[in-house]
A protein has these predicted regions:
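N-terminal secretory/membrane targeting signals
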Residues: 1-23
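N-terminal, Lys/Arg-enriched amphipathic/low-complexity engagement segments
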Residues: 51-138, 305
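Exposed loop/turn and edge beta-strand positions of beta-sandwich/beta-sheet ligand-binding modules
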Residues: 133, 164, 180
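Short, solvent-exposed loop/turn positions at domain surfaces
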Residues: 133, 139, 156-159, 366
């Protein structure tokens, strides 16, 4: 009997152990289930709150409320751990842009300034977008002109006259395809003489100011958005925008441009205030330790921008301050040099296109600044520089400038001449592994220096339009650039309008073109889209 009880007891103990083990297994399974359910609930809750947070941020930006701080449910940890802002920004309107890219390029101009001895200048109709290729000439070879004398006008808008940048003799009228006019070249006088003006009265109306600017030849320095056209004098702009700093690769320091001329710049801003019922906005550089000299300007709304290129583009600033559009949302833009031109005209009664030009890029022996006038001959402008053999000269910056020869001329709106080596040398196994330092937004190619000797090599050829997020990494604008470009290619007007074509000009997409893995000519595509929209009225 006892022998029977012993195995029976063992059996009961085993059964109890198995039962306990199964209960513990069920309990463990329940814990896993409840844990997964709780995790799923937390993820769902986070998604809902994140979507609500994003909607709040988007709506606050549309309402113009998100000037400095992030108006959402969550704090912006990038701002929390970012470097401390300088004291001058504490009470200012500041836009911190987290997207963009500063190309690490050598050839930054040193702050030394010399007077360029240039004898030939030109005004080029192609510098003014929207102008008919064959404008009506008012001069011919051999004519003598003063600075400010009209040399041609647009047949479509005959009230807008384009003036000679210097006084001297017209020595050539260069024509291009289909008899289009490429350049009107002037041999400058040693002693410059400006056309005399009868300035409007201090209390002149807006209409009188507009007529004076049209007659003086200064009107073409005002550009209109959308499309970056020469401003239409029959349109009253909602606002006027001026960017006072340049973030393009090895670009000029515009603080040097106004050194000793702040009174002239202030006079120009005073004129702009009388041309719009809205506001004059100045985009200021908020990246430095000390405040911008433009902060002292009165009569204008000041907005600071911090971030990588293209933070200095006026189009990016318009997008964040008050986006432009057609009709009542038309705005005007000017550069610092153009504001100075207006200031000289109204303060001293002379047409003066004097500007500082940055001679920059790794191909120049001594990157620096030269003082000259608009349309200067590039060969004379860079005289004294040793140019690296097999280099490309660009009027403007490397992203949106135009290739020129030494016989070419500085663009009317350009304040920079860049030279970099041609990238026409084969790189051994370049398709497999970059053996030389190169600029790239990709983290797979580490950039170990801020002074890379960049060439024109694009490291690839045009290929199928690949969809990725490269554009979004460098575009600090709420615009779907890939979809916009594709809508332009297929000529979908409604999609082009809805996707933001009115807010962009070629310089705004130049950095995206640099980052494009498909090597698409985005600036050219955008300009084609502008042509289509203008043709459709």
């Amino acid at each position: 009997m006892n022998n029977f009880k012993r195995p029976a007891g063992l059996s009961l103990l085993l059964l109890a152990a198995v039962s306990l083990q199964s209960q513990s297994s069920m309990s463990g399974g329940n814990l896993v289930f409840y844990g997964l359910a709780a995790l799923a609930l937390l993820i769902f809750f986070y998604i809902v709150v994140s979507v609500a947070d994003n909607f709040m941020v988007i709506e606050s930006k549309q309402m113009g409320l998100d000037d400095e701080n992030r108006a959402g449910l969550f704090p912006d940890f990038r701002q929390m751990f970012a470097s401390k802002k300088p004291g001058y920004l504490k009470e200012a309107h500041v836009y911190t842009l987290t997207k963009g890219y500063d190309i690490p390029m050598d050839g930054e101009p040193q702050e030394t300034i010399r007077d360029a001895k240039v004898t030939r200048f030109a005004i080029s109709p192609p510098d003014f977008f929207g102008l008919r290729p064959i404008p009506k000439l008012l001069v011919e070879e051999g004519d003598v002109v003063k600075a400010g004398d009209p040399v041609f006008f647009d047949k479509q808008l005959s009230r807008i006259k384009f003036a000679a940048p210097v006084s001297g003799e017209v020595i050539s009228v260069t024509r291009g395809l289909k008899r289009s006019i490429s350049e009107i070249v002037i041999l400058a006088d040693k002693e410059q003489e400006s056309r005399s003006y009868e300035l409007p009265a201090a209390g002149a109306s807006r209409e009188e100011l507009v007529e004076f600017l049209l007659e003086s030849g200064a009107w073409p320095c005002i550009r209109q958005r959308p499309y970056n056209l020469v401003a239409n004098p029959d349109v009253v702009p909602r606002d006027i925008f001026v960017s006072t700093f340049d973030t393009s690769p090895v670009g000029p320091n515009l603080n040097l441009t106004v050194r000793g001329r702040m009174d002239v710049f202030q006079a120009g801003v005073n004129v702009l205030r009388r041309l719009t019922p809205g506001l004059v906005y100045l985009g200021l550089d908020g990246r430095g330790e000390s405040d911008s000299p433009f902060a002292a300007v009165s009569g204008a709304e000041k907005r600071y921008f911090r971030g990588a290129h293209p933070a200095g583009n006026v189009g990016v600033q318009i997008h964040h301050i008050h986006p432009c559009g057609v009709g009542e949302n038309t705005v005007w833009t000017l550069g610092v040099e153009e504001v100075l031109l207006l200031g000289e005209l109204f303060q001293h009664g002379r047409y003066d296109t004097t500007r500082l030009v940055a001679i920059s890029g790794g191909s120049f022996s001594d990157p620096s600044y030269v003082r000259t006038r608009a349309g200067a001959n590039i060969g004379e402008l860079i005289a004294g520089q040793t140019l690296e053999p097999n280099s490309r000269i660009i009027s403007g910056d490397v992203l949106s400038g135009i290739q020129k020869s030494e016989e070419g001329f500085l663009g009317f709106f350009d304040n920079q001449v860049t030279a970099i080596p041609e990238g026409n040398e084969a790189e051994v196994f370049g398709w497999l592994l970059p053996l030389k330092p190169r600029a790239s937004i990709s983290p797979t190619i580490p950039v170990l220096s801020d002074n890379i000797h960049i060439t024109t090599n694009s490291h690839g050829e045009k290929r199928a339009f690949v969809v990725n997020n490269d554009y979004e990494q460098v575009m600090p604008m709420d615009i779907y650039l890939t979809q916009l470009m594709k809508s332009i290619i297929v000529n979908d007007l409604e999609s082009m309008e809805g996707l933001g074509i009115y807010e962009l000009v070629p310089e705004d997409v130049a950095l995206a073109e640099f980052a494009c893995v498909s090597k698409q000519p985005l600036q050219q595509i955008l300009r084609q889209g502008h042509d289509t929209m203008i043709a459709q009225g």
